[in-house]
From Swiss-Prot:
Protein name: CTP synthase
Summary of subunit composition and partner proteins: Homotetramer.
Gene behind this protein: pyrG
Chain positions recorded as UTP binding sites: S14, K187, T188, K189, P190, T191, Q192, K223
Keyword Signal assigned: no
Length: 545
């Protein structure tokens, strides 16, 4: 089977939505019965985004096999059924690291190592490796055409089109077509110049996705086609929409999938978008609204919690309610008190690292527990719930995590010192170990306890969820906490690690060490988020009474 590649680039400005557009196209092709995958190539020099600031880069999306990747891979998994892996995302830093390691080993036999051919060859090898076994692979190139950082990637895909054959490759370019209010018309010149930039490095786009705040008139599309040397039917108008889940239908209505299938000579049935139509209907017709407060450390950039925000919306879809998400800085809880948590139907505390704002999160968990407000804790959100309960219910006044207070009297959360790496080898780590790539990562089995809320929500005795953390519940101090009323409702397969906890005497209080948001999708939702939003709606009804 020959894999077909669609290379997706962006021009004029950044943040055009290449990832969403590419994922939407992938969803249509998948709906035609094709085996589709996606890749993201990031031009930054970091080896991966694992140690990058969430406020700068946004969230780190964790794949099933434990790769720390760009948040666009989250979009990919929410739009198509194919699960991403470490093969689906790589950076300039990763490529250079691999090439330099080979150079030190002598793999290049004394040759002068250069961007061309060594770096470009390494990029091509990874693209081909990631594309194995699929009918179509969409490869998104990060950054904007014209950026110096992107040049090796653009050169690599230019070469790959020759290597694989133009009959199996396609270049799709996203551009901005701005509307000038003073002139009362859209302007195509930025698109023309962006295509000219692509042509200067040897790439002729086959499809142009033209982003605008309105539909682009037919005469302007014809003008773009003429000056950019593409068929008029391959100039796609992609206007702003109120829901990203409308984009697959918008692209399909303009025949983009049909154009691609003919280009690749793929015989497949018409796309069935009924699942997406159902998602759009549920989103547009809520029976109510709930307000959920998310108390975090990186709230100035909502993309730092992208998957959590999307998972809450998915929970709303499954309960036919609109979810109003109120982002609250945990430091404000410390300075202003829990008054700012009033008028919420539920509270979620997501993951995070470092001491800043931690006492605000602990106060938030206490407020939810004492006021019977539905609470969902994720990763650090579970740890603060445990610390709060230990301090205020189990009588461990100094309870803390060794991440924040190494010498505390009751280290109820502590560093795991014995780990297994990707190959299964035992490795010892400490607080001084490298930060990058040294966490418990990826899908891990969790066995749920019968009779618990977690078991009821999942409807299965065993689950697999994704992790990203270094610290775990300290089993040595767990007995008095359980005796005080906290219940461990799920443990790792070897029973050594606490994965999920709950409070049986609370209407809905669940916290997990894993990240359930990474496996939530608009079509399927996720048991924890669906149950959490349902609990928020029930809490709201009780308050009205």
């Amino acid at each position: 089977m020959t894999t077909n590649y669609i290379f997706v680039t962006g021009g004029v400005v950044s943040s055009l939505g290449k990832g969403i557009a590419a994922a939407s196209l992938a969803a249509i092709l998948e709906a035609r019965g094709l085996n589709v995958s996606m890749m993201k190539l990031d031009p930054y020099i970091n080896v991966d985004p694992g140690t990058m600031s969430p406020i700068q880069h946004g969230e780190v999306f964790v794949t099933e096999d434990g790769a720390e990747t760009d948040l666009d891979l989250g979009h990919y998994e929410r739009f198509i059924r194919t699960k991403m892996s470490r093969r689906n995302n790589f950076t300039t830093g990763r490529i250079y690291s691999d090439v330099l390691r080979k150079e030190r080993r002598g793999d290049y036999l004394g040759a002068t190592v250069q961007v061309i051919p060594h770096i470009t060859n390494a990029i091509k090898e990874r693209i081909l490796e990631g594309g194995e076994g699929h009918d179509v692979v969409l490869v998104e190139i990060g950054g904007t055409v014209g950026d110096i950082e992107s040049l090796p990637f653009l050169e690599a895909i230019r070469q790959l089109a020759v290597d694989v054959g133009r009959e199996h490759t396609m270049f799709m370019h996203l551009t901005l077509v701005p509307y000038m209010a003073a002139a009362g018309e859209v302007k195509t010149k930025p698109t023309q110049h962006s295509v000219k930039e692509l042509l200067s490095i040897g790439i002729q786009p086959d499809v142009l996705i033209c982003r605008s705040d309105r539909a682009i008139p037919a005469n302007e599309r014809a003008k773009i086609a003429l000056f950019c040397n593409v068929p008029e039917k391959a100039v796609i108008s992609l206007k702003d929409v109120d829901s990203i889940y409308k984009i697959p239908g918008l692209l399909k209505s303009q025949g983009l999938d049909e154009f691609i299938c003919k280009r690749f000579n793929l015989a497949c049935p018409a796309a069935d978008l009924s699942e997406w139509e159902q998602v759009i209907f549920e989103e547009a017709n809520p029976a109510g609204e709930v307000t959920i407060g998310m108390v975090g450390k990186y709230v100035e950039l909502p993309d730092a919690y992208k998957s959590v925000i999307e998972a809450l919306k998915h929970g709303g879809l499954k309960n036919r309610v609109s979810v109003n998400i109120k982002l609250i800085d945990s430091q404000n809880v410390e300075t202003k008190g829990t008054e700012i948590l009033k008028d919420l139907d539920a509270i979620l505390v997501p993951g995070g690292f470092g001491y800043r704002g931690i006492e605000g999160k602990i106060a938030t968990a206490r407020y939810a527990r004492e006021n019977n407000i539905p609470y969902l804790g994720i990763c650090l959100g579970m740890q603060v719930a445990l610390m709060e309960f230990a301090r205020n219910v189990a009588g461990m006044e100094d309870a803390n995590s060794t991440e924040f207070m190494p010498d505390c009297k009751y280290p109820v959360v502590a560093l795991i010192t014995e780990w297994r790496d990707e190959e299964g080898n035992v490795e010892m780590r400490s607080e001084d170990s490298d930060l990058g790539g040294t966490m418990r990562l990826g899908g891990q089995q969790c066995n749920l306890v019968d009779g618990t809320l977690a078991r009821q929500l999942y409807g299965a005795p065993s689950i697999v969820e994704r992790h990203r953390h270094r610290y775990e519940v300290n089993n040595m101090l767990l007995k008095p906490i359980e005796a005080a009323g906290l219940r461990v409702s799920g443990r790792s397969a070897d029973h050594s690690l606490v994965e999920i906890i709950e409070l049986p005497n609370h209407p809905w209080f669940v916290a997990s060490q894993f990240h359930p948001e990474f496996t939530s999708t608009p079509r399927d939702g996720h048991p924890l988020f669906s149950g959490f939003v349902k609990a928020a709606a029930e809490y709201q009804k009780r308050q009205v009474k």
